[in-house]
């Protein structure tokens, strides 16, 4: 079977409903927390570490929910949403690889913010570089990522960690 290497908004919504990777497996959050409109490229080869990569995008418009509340009179996309999007994509990668279980963000190393997403922006691009995938009792991916707005890098994160668990009862 050939793996799909790009995903539309509808594909991602199917993933948020648990329909893409099957019941009980990795899901993306539903809107409004789904911070990705499309995955333009996913591969288990390539990237900075030659272990896999993802490129995804979010279309920006002034009507997005977070601009109304963060901050009044000074609208900016919360940086934590960009960080969460990177975790979402690492979890998606694990599901795409066929790892069973529900995804959970497990942490990260260094995160740096050196720019912002304003309502005047057009597009956010996420780049994820898989460093390592551990398979066993816990399936875990470790990745580095970056967020760019209209072609300019504004956030980086090292050591993004996401695991998939067949049971989250004792998590």
Curated annotation (Swiss-Prot):
Family, per the entry? Belongs to the thioester dehydratase family. FabA subfamily.
Recorded GO molecular functions are: (3R)-hydroxyacyl-[acyl-carrier-protein] dehydratase activity; trans-2-decenoyl-acyl-carrier-protein isomerase activity
TM ranges are none
Q: What's a Pfam family this protein contains?
A: FabA
Taken from the UniProt entry, a GO cellular component term is: cytoplasm
Source domain of life is: Bacteria
Q: What is its EC number?
A: 4.2.1.59, 5.3.3.14
What does the subunit section of this Swiss-Prot or TrEMBL entry state?
Answer: Homodimer.
This chain's function reads: Necessary for the introduction of cis unsaturation into fatty acids. Catalyzes the dehydration of (3R)-3-hydroxydecanoyl-ACP to E-(2)-decenoyl-ACP and then its isomerization to Z-(3)-decenoyl-ACP. Can catalyze the dehydratase reaction for beta-hydroxyacyl-ACPs with saturated chain lengths up to 16:0, being most active on intermediate chain length.
Keywords, A to Z, come to:
Cytoplasm, Fatty acid biosynthesis, Fatty acid metabolism, Isomerase, Lipid biosynthesis, Lipid metabolism, Lyase
Q: Which reaction does it catalyse?
A: a (3R)-hydroxyacyl-[ACP] = a (2E)-enoyl-[ACP] + H2O; (3R)-hydroxydecanoyl-[ACP] = (2E)-decenoyl-[ACP] + H2O; (2E)-decenoyl-[ACP] = (3Z)-decenoyl-[ACP]
Question: Please, one GO biological process term?
Answer: unsaturated fatty acid biosynthetic process
Q: In which pathway does it act?
A: Lipid metabolism; fatty acid biosynthesis
| Keyword Mitochondrion tagged | no
In its UniProt entry, the species of origin is given as: Pseudomonas savastanoi pv. phaseolicola (strain 1448A / Race 6)
Q: Can you say what this protein is called? A: 3-hydroxydecanoyl-[acyl-carrier-protein] dehydratase
The places in or outside the cell where this protein is found are: Cytoplasm
- Active-site residues are 70
Does the entry feature the keyword Transferase, yes or no?
Answer: no
Gene expressing this chain: fabA
SUPFAM superfamilies annotated for this entry?
Answer: Thioesterase/thiol ester dehydrase-isomerase (SSF54637)
